[in-house]
Amino acid sequence: VSSTENLALPTGYQLQDYEIRKVLSSGGFSFVYLACDKDKNTVAIKEYLPISIALRADNATVQPNADDVALFRRGLKCFFDEGLSLAKIDHKNIVRVLNFFRANETVYMVMQYERGKSLQEYILGQQSLVSEQFIRRVFGELSNGLREVHTQKLLHLDIKPANIYIRLDGSPVLLDFGSARQALSENLAKFSPSYTPGFASPEQYYDRKLLGPWSDIYSIGATMYACLTRTSPPAANQRIKNDLLVPAVKLGKDHYSQSLLEIIDSCLSLDYLERPQSVFSLQKALLESKPLPKKKSSLVNKIVLALNKPILIKKTPAQKAAITHTNTI
């Protein structure tokens, strides 16, 4: 199926109680729309439409390829179960699922529309190094929400700077559960994985039966590493063959506390047993350790910034939206 055949729902389309305004983004599994409800509140709506195995008919219904009906339905159930689980989570650091329903032979998830900027945009917009205080606060707060996600037997599996939003009040919110699945279920290995090189754990490449909270913790470590370097770490599958990752304790020793750098390096351990085993233990370490005293920006800082021009972190129009679903950074 050509992706050009997968036409998004048009502007003005009435989807139950919601009117479609525009497409925010699209990815391998879904479209995300900006819409308004009957009270004119702005929301984001995610539609399950895996482009490799299904297309949209003229009457807006989604039709799987004849050979892929079973796979489509498996993914549909996964998406629906994900909506059920996320709808139970009412946490300020997790994007709020307001509603989910079936229509057009597929499933829709209605989410709160967030205003602010992605962590990716924040990192690239800084004139100096991202402060240790900011890193500890953002990831400490985000850990509260991620603990709730793990309590629901869900994993995110695509945590990265583009999927963390910084609201106008400075609080972080975790977006885009496009890779989230009932990750403790055996059926998941059969559905195509979706992850971002550099931020995905080794288990996501090699043995999905080993997935657990420690897999999201690897991605948290990689995202904190990106705060230091403005680039993503080397991909885990490349690291296993030839580990060229420069440890955080070496990279950031003049600018960040030893304790923070050690936390980042432990999260990025290739062996999942060497990482923090729960978000609670990671959060405890982040909140207990003392940051270095604040320093004024120096010439060295400016040189470090110049040398660490963004390589893999790129802005796209979709990532300026409050909800994103892309597999790039």
Report residues per predicted region.
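Protein kinase glycine-rich loop
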Residues: 21-27, 32
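C-terminal lobe helix-coil module of Hanks-type protein kinase domains
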Residues: 198-294
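Activation segment signature within eukaryotic-like protein kinase domains
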Residues: 138-139
